Every structure is written in structure tokens, then in C-alpha cells.
Amino acid sequence: MWFKNLLIYRLTQDLPVDAEALETALATKLARPCASQELTTYGFVAPFGKGEDAPLVHVSGDFLLISARKEERILPGSVVRDAVKEKVEEIEAEQMRKVYKKERDQIKDEIIQAFLPRAFIRRSSTFAAIAPKQGLILVNSASPKRAEDLLSTLREVIGTLPVRPLTVKTAPTAVMTEWVTTQQAAPDFFVLDECELRDTHEDGGIVRCKRQDLTSEEIQLHLSTGKVVTQLSLAWQDKLSFMLDDKMTVKRLKFEDLLQDQAEQDGGDEALGQLDASFTLMMLTFGDFLPALVEALGGEETPQGI
């Protein structure tokens, strides 16, 4: 279990439930298939394993892992629009009258209900790691919407969830721009070969660089004309590489082979043991990586009133 993306949230108070109570709470909103007339469903599933006995909360030392699954019926908008248009034209031709918005909307609703049972189904899962002692929730997603879906549903089942996105004192854009300009990153961080540069004007240009020497004159010229770094590929120690963006989202997270080999050795021959070992090692690595990242970005900013 290696996360590929990271959205970082700060618990502003202690988590109001322990692992056992959390297990009970998640069981009140289990993931389930869409009924024939449902567009979407959302609920919790076991992060590891299948079957009724698989726990909804995986506990490893001081860390908890949960997973939510969304199931949705896919109705292409173009298909619905074409069907509505065809039905409206049929009514107007047969009844010699104009179909207005209210009736058109009703026709659309009827067509959606008729198409729903035949629609394709898409499933997607979102994992979140909870580190109560560190006061963090880490969501394995680069989409704030998907993270908020999980967090709001978690809040619903436990009654309260005092959490906010972790913020830093120095804007990531300012720090990343300085690192590329000076060709020197914070201790243990290394600039790699990919970045995105944006003009500070609203309608300014965007330059995306991949497999390029970011110390080159071309890059420095873009920076000297006012562009700033909004995404930057980085490595930390010899343990992981990632892409950092201007909103402090960690994307394309990749753990180096040394860590993965260690997890394989620690996990034994069973699949569950391998998953547990990789999750534990990942969280221990985050325990060093995240404080270093926050410090490199000027330290954590606590909003007023919190």
C-alpha cells in the first residue's frame, strides 16, 4: 500500500474516536451498489481484504487506514441531449405546439430515469491514512473534491471531524521559484527535471518542461521575465520522489526501490502482510518527510481563530 498522491489535512483537535469506535461508525455507512434508479452511492469498504470479516479500519501501530468507494452510473451528456431533442421534436411535430423549458426539463428527467438501469457503472476508491499522534489525515488523492467527499462522509458517521488543510507560512510557489532560480533546494531535497512555469498575469503564458535541465539559461530567462514555478519535480533523501504544486499537493509520489524491498522483506509471504508492511513503512517515512517539507516551506501556518 503505497500512496501515489497526497493531500495533507491537520486535525485541529484530537480525533473524537478510537479505532474500535471508528470501525463501528464506518459500518453505519457501507459502500453498496447503485440501485436501478440511483445515479451514485458512496460508503466505506475494507482497505485490505474482502468479505464481511475484513475490518473497515486497518490498524498498524499508531496509524489507521480507511477506504471509501464511490459507485456511479455513467450517462453521457450527449446521449441524454440527443434523446431529449428527439423527443421534443416528436412532440412539437405531432401536437403542433412549442415545448417550453419546464416541460423540456421534465422530459429530460424521464429520459434519465429510463436510461439509468442500462448505464455503465464506474467504481473508484479513495484511501486515507490517519495519524492521531501527529494530528494528521493524509488522503491518497490529488483531487480536493475526492478528499472532501471522504472527509465529509467520515464527519457524517462520527459526528464531528475537526480538520482543515495543512497550510504553510511561505507560498510553495515562492519557495519553488527560489530553488530553481538559485539552483539550490532545502537540505535533503533535490530539484529534478520537470516543472511548470506560469506568468503572474491572469492571462499570461504557461511553460511546461519535462526531462530538461532546470539550471539552463532558457529556464532562467523565463524566471527573469517574471514567470514563477507552480509545479516542480523533487526528490527527498534517497527515499522518494514527487511533484509539488502551488497548492501544496504532492503528486506522482514514488517510493524508491530500497524502501519497497524493505517492505517486501518485512511483510513475509502473505499478501496482507505485504500490504501492512508497506503501509507501516510508508507512514514512518512520512513521519520524517512531512515535517521536512513543512519546514522547507517556512513552517506550518495556523489560521487565526483556530
UniProtKB/Swiss-Prot annotation:
List the molecular function annotations (GO) for this entry: double-stranded DNA binding
Q: Which InterPro entries match?
A: RdgC
Keywords from UniProt, A to Z, are: Cytoplasm, DNA recombination
The record's subcellular locations are: Cytoplasm, Nucleoid
Q: Which GO terms describe its biological process?
A: DNA recombination; regulation of DNA recombination
| Superkingdom as given in the UniProt entry | Bacteria
Q: Which GO terms describe its cellular component?
A: bacterial nucleoid; cytoplasm
The yes or no answer to whether the keyword Nucleotidyltransferase is present is no
- Mind telling me which Pfam families this protein's record contains? RdgC (PF04381)
Q: Which family does it belong to?
A: Belongs to the RdgC family.
What is known about what this protein does?
May be involved in recombination.
Instruction: Report the protein name in the record.
Output: Recombination-associated protein RdgC
Write the gene name: rdgC
